[in-house]
Amino acid sequence: MSPGLDLEQSFSQTLEGFGLSDQAARLIWLPLPMLLVLVAAVVGVLVTVWLERKISAAVQQRIGPEYAGALGVLQPLADGLKLLVKEDIIPARADGLLFTLGPVLVVVPVILSWLIVPFGQNLLISNVGVGIFLWISLSSVQPIGLLMSGYASNNKYSLLGGLRAAAQSISYEIPLALAVLAVVMMSNSLSTVDIVSQQTGAGILSWNIWRQPVGFLIFWICALAECERLPFDLPEAEEELVAGYQTEYAGMKFALFYLGSYINLVLSALLVSVLYLGGWGFPVPVEWLAGWLGQSVDAPLVQVITGATGIVMTVLKAYLLVFIAILLRWTTPRVRIDQLLDLGWKFLLPLALVNLLVTAALKLAFPVAFGG
């Protein structure tokens, strides 16, 4: 695993410099990673919701939000405040415990998955050696929460929506994992930092999208299905199921579903950026940038510039994919449930298996180009 800056140790040493003991410093550190992840996830959601409203308005030749702040940038905050003050209703015949636990099981694994997303060589909360495996494991918890919410609502539309959500998630989880496995095979690591580092040799030409074009398409299609974005929004199809598993929810419980959906979309876009688009890497080699500045690669100026712009590059790549996902919402029709399951089991799964086998063969035949 690539060595990186130990954020916990650096934080503890800084506090010890102010006279705090090592134990006190570590105690203060404990809640900070999750707080940072939560803030980053919420900010990402606010930006994405505003972008979706404005882009959707542009596609439909409308103006969109414009009164809540300049260009309507405060509209997502207004939406959140509205949901915060709405009454929290639990249906009379619903299972109260499962009804409350369902949204929590949906949103918590998605937020925890942000722990493994690197925004730079040393800029991540936790450089877990099995980060990809951790993310896949956490994402497999979400269908349980969706099915639980649909069942606990004691509503036929909610139950059908929960069953659809669970079936859809399971169907697309497997080809998604196989697509990621091909990338892991090339980088020889389950660490997201190592996967990005493997793509930083020759700028844009090193990105995995050129060596894994089929895997990239499989991953992106499966990610959209996991996020329940059009054309894969069958679990909450308004014309068929009212609002699916969300039908009986209101107030902050509904807000958790809303939040989880957008956090998952931004997370999926960030992971595509990390796995296939070079993450924090520049489109040109860093050596070229250092040459233009007349500095060595290890010079402090070059390190500061690459560190700052690495964050920008990761976010820009991710939001380009978010933009594409928003456009797809308004340009593609919803598929039927049988078409959705056929696509996952009869097309994407065999294609992902073939892609994995071809990647293994190419790794043996061309070890330098495919990470042998």
Swiss-Prot record:
GO function term, MF aspect, one: quinone binding
Catalytic activity: a plastoquinone + NADH + (n+1) H(+)(in) = a plastoquinol + NAD(+) + n H(+)(out); a plastoquinone + NADPH + (n+1) H(+)(in) = a plastoquinol + NADP(+) + n H(+)(out)
Subcellular location(s) per record: Cellular thylakoid membrane
One GO process term, biological-process aspect: photosynthesis, light reaction
GO cellular component terms, A-Z: plasma membrane-derived thylakoid membrane
Enzyme Commission number, as recorded: 7.1.1.-
Chief location category: membrane
Family statement: Belongs to the complex I subunit 1 family.
Subunit structure: NDH-1 is composed of at least 11 different subunits.
Record's protein name: NAD(P)H-quinone oxidoreductase subunit 1
Organism field: Synechococcus sp. (strain WH7803)
